[in-house]
Amino acid sequence: MEQLLAQLHTCSELIAEGYSSTGNIGWLNEFCATFLDFASDLKARLPEVAPSGANLDVETIFLCLTQVVTCITHLERTISMEAPHMTRQHFLDRLDWCLRRLLVSLTQLEGNVTPVKNLEDHSFVELMDLALDHLDDYMEKLAQQRNNSLHILEESFTEDTYQLASIVNHIVRHALAFANVAIHSDKKALTALCETLLAECATFHEEAGEPNSGHRKLEALSLERALYALESFLNEALLHLLFVSLIDLENASVEKLKDALQRDPAGAQELISAFDTNMDRIQQIGVLAIAFSQDIKTKTIVRSCLASLESLDACIVPALQLPESTSSAHHAEVLQEHFNQELLIFRNVIHEIIDSCSLINNYLDMLGERIHVQDKSHLKLIVQRGGVVVDHFRLPVNYSGLSEDGKRVHKDLILILRECQAVVNLDVPVDPKRIVKRLKILYSVLAKLRDLICRDNLEPDSSVASEAQVPSSATRTFVRSSRSFGKRHRSFVKQTGNCSVFGPQDSLAESGHSESDLISFQITEILRLD
């Protein structure tokens, strides 16, 4: 460990040198070489100092490794194009932060200081797991208790470390944080579902001590249904917001923001406000994508994108507002390119983890509601959102999953969507029946594609599916290691069986080397830079 800490110290000294160096890239080459040694040694040492993957410090290490690689890439370009000091400082500050966080995390791992994971540190999905497992425990014990021993059960239940009321409160906090950026109709529905959940939780706890086990079982089931209802709707609201945000990224892009600021700085405030709102939405989508995702590499990439976008969000608009000069143009250009690259990575990784059938279903719901709408602006918007589905299948991993019939229908989708875009964007008046006809064809083609994908997904696992039927009342979610696994099916993410997030009993050596593979990925990136 002393060698790792010494390498980090050397890296920090080189970053300090970078603040004062102008045009000299020698210190950056030395930094890359030293950091490569550090990452290689860390890969060999990590199974020893972090035997379990379920660790906040390990997550921080992976995030920092990814951020260092990202910053080095853009810092190299910044130096080569002789961008101004403020551009260089932006990336140096982020590198410095990463090195300091790496130092803290490694020190805690070396000292066997396991960070206490409070409820505040749990994701929405982890909190749902805790709450549902909590209720499962209670229901199992309730079934074994006679009425005369029910009071003993109630006393032991309330003494649990993670009291259910506290867990539910944190679930509601996550849901309301998302509701703050959700579309208006979903915000109202999420708020109502949160109120219902809190009411059911209050009833469950207020009735503690009720001598009738039948009543207690009904109250527990009502609370469980309220939890499922909230999780299920949040999945759908997340998909709604994804459609809205990805389109808003086009309508309020950095390029359009830059043009608006150059033409009319005062009049660009509305676009700046829309840009800020969309960044808040992207952050919430990312947070929930991390919570729902099963793969540690995917989680790390999303975390890194969010970290980059958050740091850029604070400085990209001011960069575009700087007085026009060569240095300010270079500064804005570097930040703009970095921003667009991070958005592209974010968009691709979200499309990679999202469930294709659920995405199409969500769009079909929106399309079905608006087919007969006469307002042309609304029709343009809904057709534009269809491009999100097309983009989803531009990703090789999603397109390759289509059968031959699916690929044929996908071609039909592209053709009919182009027709819809053409007809709603015509400047001359168009017979509404022509628009409705094309939208109905679009709906039919999408429904056919959805049915083909769902059929293909079910056929390989039909034997498994027959053994573990999903109840009709279940939400469209599932969990990593929760006992409620069989009851839940997440609509946001693909339903994959190979989960690479470790339970507390798993070790790095026994986990398929996912953590080591992730470090190998980072090392490869660093080598590519050299």
UniProtKB/Swiss-Prot annotation:
Membrane among keywords: yes
Localisation per UniProt entry: Cytoplasm; Cell membrane
Xref: Gene3D superfamilies: Alpha-catenin/vinculin-like
Cystine bridges: none
Gene Ontology terms: cellular component: adherens junction; catenin complex; cleavage furrow; cytosol; plasma membrane
Molecular functions (GO terms): actin filament binding; beta-catenin binding
Keywords: Cell membrane, Cytoplasm, Developmental protein, Membrane
Membrane topology (UniProt): Peripheral membrane protein
Keyword hit for Disulfide bond: no
Subcellular location, principal: cytoplasm
InterPro entries the UniProt entry points to: Serendipity_A (IPR008837)
Tissue and organ distribution: Transient expression in blastoderm from nuclear cycle 11 to the onset of gastrulation.
Function: Required for the cellularization of the syncytial blastoderm embryo. Involved in the localization of the actin filaments just prior to and during plasma membrane invagination. Sry-alpha together with nullo and bnk may provide auxiliary functions, by acting both to stabilize a large and dynamic microfilament structure and regulate its functions.
Protein name: Serendipity locus protein alpha
Protein encoded by which gene: Sry-alpha
